[in-house]
């Protein structure tokens, strides 16, 4: 446990819960024909921005090319409504937070459970209902947006 790590964790949690952050994607886990064997795709220059109760997707072509987070997904228009649940601190200090991404049609919903690791700004997001339209689990970092 480093002071830098604890600070990064605190800043990330604060930025997320106040609805003012960027989630930089590092790896996306793509379902394959064998459900237990996810394909890992490294990604760069792709991120989500959370502003208040909105989630906006900025995905590079490499990611768009494989239809990540698209199809009949809530992020089709590039932006969706977001509900952030109450943070739950686990015994090891990791924090679990549920995220609900709601598209323009009521059935276009992603349910995500984010784990923010206790001594860093790294998070992993577990997608529920993975079969639905490019709803993938992923790993990344949470960074605060600069105050405007």
Regions found by a protein language model. Give the residues of each.
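Short small/polar-residue motifs
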Residues: 7-10, 43-46, 76-88, 107-113
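Helix-rich interaction surfaces within compact, conserved domain-sized segments
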Residues: 83-148
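Intrinsically disordered, low-complexity segments enriched in small/polar residues
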Residues: 3, 17, 69, 75-76, ...
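Generic preference for flexible, low-structure residues
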Residues: 14, 37-39, 66, 71, ...
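Short amphipathic alpha-helical surface micro-motifs
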Residues: 3-7, 38-39, 64-67, 78-82, ...
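N-terminal secretory signal peptides
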Residues: 2-66, 136
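Amphipathic hydrophobic-ligand
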Residues: 40-43, 75-80, 134-140
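Mature extracytoplasmic domains of secretory-pathway proteins
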Residues: 48-94
């Amino acid at each position: 446990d480093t002071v830098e790590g604890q600070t990064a964790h605190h800043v990330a949690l604060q930025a997320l819960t106040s609805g003012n952050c960027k989630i930089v994607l590092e790896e996306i886990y793509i379902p394959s024909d064998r459900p237990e064997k996810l394909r890992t795709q490294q990604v760069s220059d792709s991120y989500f921005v959370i502003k208040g109760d909105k989630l906006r997707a900025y995905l590079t072509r490499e990611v768009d090319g494989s239809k990540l987070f698209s199809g009949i997904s809530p992020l089709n228009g590039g932006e969706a409504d977001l509900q952030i649940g109450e943070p739950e601190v686990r015994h090891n200090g990791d924090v679990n937070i549920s995220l609900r991404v709601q598209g323009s049609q009521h059935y276009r919903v992603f349910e995500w459970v984010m784990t923010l690791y206790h001594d860093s700004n790294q998070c992993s997001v577990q997608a529920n209902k993975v079969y639905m339209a490019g709803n993938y689990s992923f790993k990344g970092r949470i960074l605060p947006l600069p105050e405007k």
